[in-house]
Regions:
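Sequence/structural signature of beta-propeller domains
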Residues: 28-365
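Secretory targeting and sorting signals
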Residues: 2-30
Length: 365
């Protein structure tokens, strides 16, 4: 099930493997420029035959991705109201679906892996922390534990916010315990939940940016290095969908308690930004380099941290022919682990053809 409106045509040719390069813009500071960074796009799973190494009908409009330290990759399949798991060894050109686990929930978007002891679930006889937690476009927070819940069956709905449309989810540790952060696109705010799934009352200033133009709302939220990054897109209040277009987007960085640290990016190459990830260390970019993926045009922009605070535009991923990389319907960006994909790989998810299909793959150096 998808709650999203249609009619946003976007055509991009896909292949199983294609070459990409990161090209710094001519305006970048010369003494801090980096040579072109060549990477590969490896398409591993799709619902369509011939588009990737593995075909899986469940993978329609895969949105959020998450990984535990040693788990397979979890995908939120918005189009089939499911979450499925995939294994892929570092450097592999194939992926395997885990057949023993399939979690169902309505229109999932963002998701997180929970390594802690909070967010406890119980079935009356057994209690254990949720290991994976999801946000949905129906305004719900859902959770699942292999010790408590069926391996093939529904996730537990733990919180429902009337009128909310959650597009993204993050998890962070604070002085008051672990917290969930949900990007409530329809109501234009970040909703926070404690480790018992109870809503947290925020100060009036929390996760507020007075410089943000009217009509922009949190489209995604991501925890990176203990900081909370929020990607903003222009809201269509009639459909609760984003309004894509060149320059339509902002990214902010906050503390875990919601204090604005800096504006990361404004307009420019942003186009309904959603994917947020740090560059893998093996790619040779400065520590803290941020990748921002656009849902609107499928481009990935690179922002380099400044020694004086803030971030600098540092180019976009391009293919080896010099064309800007475009992944149709791009959603998540997520660094791999030593067991799933490798720490030098960046997983991506996408809902091509106006979210009617799905693609899961990696970007590798």
């Amino acid at each position: 099930m998808s709650l999203r409106s249609k009619g946003r045509p976007f055509a991009v040719a896909t292949a199983l493997v294609s070459g990409l390069a990161l090209i710094a813009p001519a305006t970048a500071d010369a003494h801090r420029s980096h040579p072109p960074l060549a990477v590969q796009q490896v398409n591993l799973v799709s619902d369509q035959a011939g588009k990737a190494a593995l075909q899986d009908a469940d993978l329609v409009n895969p949105w959020g991705l998450s990984l535990g330290a040693t788990t397979p990759l979890w995908s939120s399949n918005n189009g089939t109201s499911s979450s499925t798991l995939y294994s892929s060894a570092p450097g592999s050109s194939t992926a395997t679906k885990v057949p023993t686990v399939r979690v169902t929930l309505p229109a999932p978007t963002g998701q997180v892996s929970n390594p802690g002891t909070g967010f406890v679930l119980s079935n009356g006889t057994t209690s254990a922390p949720a290991r994976f937690i999801f946000a949905t476009e129906t305004g719900q927070i859902a959770a699942w534990s292999p010790q408590v819940d069926a391996l093939i069956g529904p996730a537990e709905i733990k919180a429902t916010t009337p009128g909310a449309v959650y597009k993204g989810l993050a998890l962070a540790t604070t002085g008051s315990g672990d917290r969930l952060y949900a990007a409530n696109f329809a109501q234009q705010r970040i909703d926070v939940f404690d480790s018992a799934f109870h809503p947290v009352t925020l100060p009036h200033w929390a996760f507020r940016d007075s410089r943000l133009p009217r009509g922009y709302a949190p489209f995604n939220v991501q925890t990176l290095n203990g900081r909370i990054f929020v990607a903003y897109a222009l809201l269509d209040a009639q459909t609760n969908d984003e309004i894509a277009g060149p320059g339509r987007g902002f990214v902010d960085e906050y503390t875990a308690d919601g204090r604005l640290i800096t504006r990361v990016a404004s307009r420019g190459t942003l186009n309904a930004p959603w994917g947020l990830a740090l560059a893998p260390a093996a790619w040779g970019l400065p520590a803290g380099t941020l990748f921002v993926g656009n849902f609107g045009d499928g481009h990935i922009t690179v922002f380099r941290p400044s020694a004086y605070g803030g971030y600098h535009f540092a180019g976009q991923l391009r293919d080896t022919n010099g064309r800007t990389l475009a992944i149709d319907g791009l959603w998540a960006l997520l660094q791999g682990t030593a067991t799933t994909g490798g720490t030098d790989a960046l997983w991506f998810s996408a809902g091509p053809d106006d979210e009617t299909h799905g693609l899961l793959g990696q970007l590798r150096r």
